[in-house]
Amino acid sequence: ITWLSPLQNENYREYMLNSPIMLQKLNQNKLLLSREELNFWPQREPLWDAIGVGNMKDSEEKILVLVENKSNLKELRSKLASKNENNKRLILDTMKETYDELGIKGDFNKWFDTYYQIANRITFMHQLMKKGYKVKVVFLNIVEDYMYNNISKTQWVDEYCKMLNEIIGERFVPRDILIIDLKVHEDK
């Protein structure tokens, strides 16, 4: 994986996929994505904690890796906050389209009133895959960080199972999503 953000020489800046700098970086790495292909979402897109481009195994085909980092269980919960009615409508329509196309049985209301950030990441992945891109979304959870939030792997697993059951209708991790638990401090 070639990481495009966050980079030390850019002061660890996070990017939206549609930012001119990120589109240029993606294109330079042979992942040809245009702003028009992102028109399923308003101009103000989610900021990704990390964005990378990799090669598919035994192929020249590229894969887009989008990372969302979590260090606190409370960060899993969020609501759609857009005040612009046109933007809100576009977001809800795109999320509902994703929900329907994936055949999800969970509570759609939880997508925008309880677990919005997680659901919009799933939506981005699905919409890009519909356009022919290979995409992986990584939820990177910080585990047992006794210097900040001492959350165990068990706590993360329990919370994700609960969330997935509510938004997906089952306790499984959707295909092309990876949940990684990272222990940042090995010794106390």
Regions found by a protein language model. Name each.
Residues 75-137:
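Acidic, metal/cofactor-coordinating or nucleic-acid-engaging core segments within structured domains
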Residues 50-52, 63-71, 121:
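Conserved catalytic cores of phosphodiester-cleaving nucleases, focusing on short active-site segments
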Residues 17-60:
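Active-site metal-binding core of divalent-cation-utilizing nuclease and nuclease-like domains
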Residues 1-26:
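A structured, charge-rich N-terminal accessory region that forms the first stable segment of a protein
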Residues 59-60, 73-77, 130, 145-149:
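Short catalytic/ligand-binding loop motif for oxyanion handling, primarily in non-cytosolic enzymes
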Residues 119-188:
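Non-catalytic C-terminal interaction segments of nucleic acid-processing enzymes
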Residues 66-73, 140-144:
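Short loop/turn segments at strand-loop or loop-helix junctions that form parts
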Residues 45-49, 62-66, 113-115, 134:
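Extracellular structured ligand-interaction cores
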